[in-house]
Each structure stands twice: as structure tokens, then as C-alpha cells.
UniProtKB/Swiss-Prot annotation:
NCBIfam families, alphabetized: lepA (TIGR01393), small_GTP (TIGR00231)
Record keywords, A-Z: Cell inner membrane, Cell membrane, GTP-binding, Hydrolase, Membrane, Nucleotide-binding, Protein biosynthesis
SMART domains (UniProt xref): EFG_C (SM00838)
A GO MF term: GTPase activity
PANTHER family membership: TRANSLATION FACTOR GUF1 HOMOLOG, CHLOROPLASTIC, TRANSLATION FACTOR GUF1-RELATED
Gene Ontology CC: plasma membrane
Record lineage: Bacteria, Bacillati, Cyanobacteriota, Cyanophyceae, Nostocales
Protein name as annotated: Elongation factor 4
Major localization class: membrane
CDD domains documented for this protein: EF4_II (cd03699), EF4_III (cd16260), LepA (cd01890), lepA_C (cd03709)
EC number(s) on file: 3.6.5.n1
Keyword Transmembrane helix set for record: no
Domain tr-type G, residue spans: 7-189
Amino acid sequence: MTDVPAVRIRNFCIIAHIDHGKSTLADRLLQATGTVDERQMKEQFLDNMDLERERGITIKLQAARMNYQAKDGQQYVLNLIDTPGHVDFSYEVSRSLAACEGALLVVDASQGVEAQTLANVYLALEHNLEIIPVLNKIDLPGAEPDRVIGEIEEIIGLDCSGAILASAKEGIGISEILEAVVERIPPPPNTVDQRLRALIFDSYYDIYRGVIVYFRVMDGTVKKGDRVYLMASEKEYEIDELGVLSPTQKPVDELHAGEVGYFGAAIKAVADARVGDTITLCNAKAAEALPGYTEANPMVFCGMFPIDADQFEDLREALEKLRLNDAALQYEPETSSAMGFGFRCGFLGLLHMEIVQERLEREYDLDLIITAPSVVYKVITTKGEELYIDNPSHLPAPNDRERIEEPYVKVEMITPETYVGTLMELSQNRRGIFKDMKYLTQGRTTLTYEIPLAEVVTDFFDQMKSRSRGYASMEYHLIGYRENPLVKLDIMINGDPVDSLAMIVHRDKAYGVGRSMAEKLKELIPRHQFKVPIQASIGSKVIASEHIPALRKDVLAKCYGGDISRKKKLLQKQAKGKKRMKSVGTVDVPQEAFMAVLRLDQS
């Protein structure tokens, strides 16, 4: 690899809402610069997880180095850092933005600006990135570039005089994009002579080489064989492999300020090479770490239990391996009276939870029971202590707590005018507080609500999509905790509380939720040899109950006529057996029952 001066390096990323054609555009850029052989080219080249291809979304961050001969005759190195577009992964976006000097803002010319685009653009502006607007999909019959340019200027306030019209699918406008990257995105500052500081923006676990770290050199130079020090985890390593990603890994001997690459150093766990950490040299440590890193905090929690108790160790190993690749996944062991041993896991949001669950089942062959998601509540005890509780069964007794506070999020929805009414109704049903409503261009509106996170994590997104026929988009971020009259709703099956079905709900909604839970469980739990009562209770007060009738064998089938006392004797014997069975028998609760909590109809 030839050494390219920092002046001819460009580090950029692509910001786009889900489905606006970001991965396809990345493919075209790789092809146009000859980085990937035509023979090896496949769609969504940078999305290398099967799950990403299937869902058509980007989850893990990828990076690619492209060599580009610009029109001015100079050879440039373009480092493309791909970013995910989904709201759950905004922490991954902020990491990749910190490694760039510029961004391509890709907007679908037929759909216009969506909520997520907006959120990511604000992140990019916070990092002072140069933003180049690109209108994608202009080959579609419904494309309205002029309207969308107006939207970008009005909503985001970006000057769109230099906006590029493109179609990644047809390959239109690709050379213009590459030229714009060279001309408009500033080169990284030339700080080769300073002490080494490099930012880790991703890492993944390789079973042969240990953790492979993707990083961007901010200052100084790093060489193969250097002993490096990671400032946040306070660990030392020797670099035994160093290289660049183009997009497959190519070894090099050294990387200078402004370059993006990877290294391997026999690191055992990703927790030791945290994303956002600063790399510096052991013998010439930098004075301070790079700014702008925040720990990704999980917002949604749920219990994961193996259906087969023998798989507990396998689940632990699988979670450890996923954790190697996923800095935001948290877990701790948990025991449940109904389901035995499992883990309490923390996620960034619902999509993150689904993806982790799907990867556990698909890549590690596990059969899991997942409990309903819950959020982190803040409990102020009578002694004035603050407790953070992510599991309803850990809630202190009513006389030990003064108040419960729940997290609120600010939800911004962008929707066509037609659906404003139904989305307002949805938000109000979810205890939302109306904050703002703005009319954008031609029949599009933004709605701003403050809604408890617990109401958003279950199925708010699905409901919003179905009510707006898929046209609305949303984005949310945490705004803090507020006090509400919340109660713990216990579900008892056959007289025993099932801790995995317990939840914390608003007092006004408790009766409705308890009622529908009991009805749903009655449908889903199979009939047993004895009568099974299902009760929903708050404290010791039962607020809803249902019964699953017993299956009974016809013990009188063999009596033809004959004495009534003989029949009575048989019936009494059966009743006695049922009674004994009721006291010792266990009720089998299927996985669907736990999932039912997710799909309670509360829209």
C-alpha cells in the first residue's frame, strides 16, 4: 500500500433512514473505485450478517478503504464507515461519526426526510461534520427532488444548492458523489508528529485471532509490534497484526494520523477493547483521552430462559460470545420459580432485543423463553434511598416505598397529514403528553409527544406503522424520570404467582391489563386434569380472574345401569384424585403465554 499524505485522505460516512438506499450506494462506491472485484460483488456487500441481508438493515458497523483517482489526477484514499440507520443503534452511529470529517446525507427522493434521518443529522452536526446532501432513487416514477430539497432546507436548514441527484440502483450520480467527497469533505488534520491517539469505533471477536479492533488514528503513528495502552480499560497489548479494510483485511506495517484500519493483539474479550476507548502507546502515553464517548446504557430489559434446563451453560456461552461483538448487550444470571435458571438481559430497544434473540436461536441453536420487556424504574424508598429496578419482581413492598418514577421519552413522528388524528389517538392511549405539532411541506406533519418508555417498548412502533399504513416514521430519546401512580400487577396461576409474568403498570390501566392478561392466558394455557384458576392481583386484592376447566375422564362409562352408590363411589374417588393432583400438580405454561404479554391489545 502506498503512503498517502493526510491531505489526500477523506473519512466519511453515510447517514440515511432505513430503506433509503444506503447499503446499495455503498456497493456502488465500492464498485466505482474498483475496491471490490465484479466477481465478488454481491448486494449489500458491507452487511455481512445473514440477518442484515434478510431484514435489509445494517446492524454491525463496517468500514471500507477505497483508492480513488480524482479528476485532478491525484490519488486519494476514501475511508467509508458504514452506519446503521435504526433508532436502536444510534449509539453505533455516534461512534462512527466521531471517526469521520464528513457525511453523505442520503434521502429518498420519493419519500423525503424521515424521523431517523433527522436524528442522525443532528448527531453529525454536533460532531461538526461537513454534510453533502444526496437525493437517491431519482429513477423512481414518484421521485420529487425539488420538493425533497425544499424539505431538507426547511427542516434541517442545510444549504442544498450543491445537492447531488443520484440513483444507486442505476448507478446515476456516483462519480459526482466521489468528486464531492474529495472536494467538499475536509482532510483529517495532519497531526502525525503528536503522540499516538486512536479511537476504537468497532470491534468483533474472531475465534482464531481474538478480538479484532477497528480504529481511526487521530494523532501520531501506530506500527506493527507497538505496545499499546487502552485508556478506559487500562490494559496493555502488543499489536501483532495491523492492516486496512478494503473491505477485506489487508495487512500493513504502519498507519498514520487520519487513517482507518484494524489491529489484532490477542485480546481475550471485547470488554477489554471498548468501543469509544482511546488507544495510545505504552512508552509515550497521550495526556488525555479522546472526547465524545458515552457508555451505551440499555433501556429495555427482559428475562431469557432456556426451554431445556441443560442448555443454561450453552446460553451463558452464547451470550458471552455475542457480548464480544455487542458492547451494548448486558446480562446477569436470574432465577425464576416458574422457569428455573436464566439471564436478565438489557438491550438498547426492541429491535436490538429481537435481533439478539434471533441470533441466539439461529447461530447457537438455542430454544428460549423470553419474558415481556420492561424498562428501568426508579424507586424512592421510605428511607430516602434511590433504587433502579429493571425486574418487576424486585420491587420493594408498598409500605417500603415512597414513590415510583418511570422513564419518559420524547417521541417525534413525521407523518402524512391524513394520519395525524389516528396517531394522536394512539399517543394519548399510551399516556402521551402532547407537546408540539408542525406542518412541514405539502401535507407532512411532525408530532412531538412525551410518552412513558414502558408504553413505547411493547408495540408502539408496530401500531404506528399499521395506523399510518407504513408512511409515518419515528425517533425517540430519553428525557428523564417522572413520578406516576404505578402498581405491580401479579399474575397467579393455580394460586402461585408467576414472577416472569409480573409487570409494573399505571393504576388506571391495571384493571384492563389484568383482565385481558387473564383472558389471554386462559386461551393459551392447555387444559389440565384439574381446574386451573388464573388471577391478576395488585398486592392481596384480586382484580380479575378466569378458570381453565378440568379435563375429565368419564369414570362412569363402564357402569351399565346398576346401583347409584357404586357410581357415587367412583365419582368421589375421581374428585379426591383431582384434589390431590391440584395440590401437587404443576401447571405447564407455554412460551406463547409469555409472548402474550407483548401483544396485549392496548392500542
